[in-house]
């Protein structure tokens, strides 16, 4: 990963949508995205361009906030760009937008 980047992509989901977004970030910026999905599923699991983390309760409010906060702390020196790659994750991001750490933005 290019350490000079000022942002870190954080993706929620585990399907081809997540892989496509991660691939776009990787091709444009050389960055490896962090992604949380419910299952160790293809094509995200074991991808070289995604730090894929399995979270069985990924769609719960508690897990969403816990995972967002953990990545915000892990990348405290960067702006974490949180993207939901599915309707349920977009809803979680919208619902908890005001409860995310300062270095996390959810457009």
Q: What residue ranges belong to the model's regions?
A:
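ATP-binding N-terminal substructure of ATP-dependent carboxylate-amine bond-forming enzymes
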Residues: 1-107
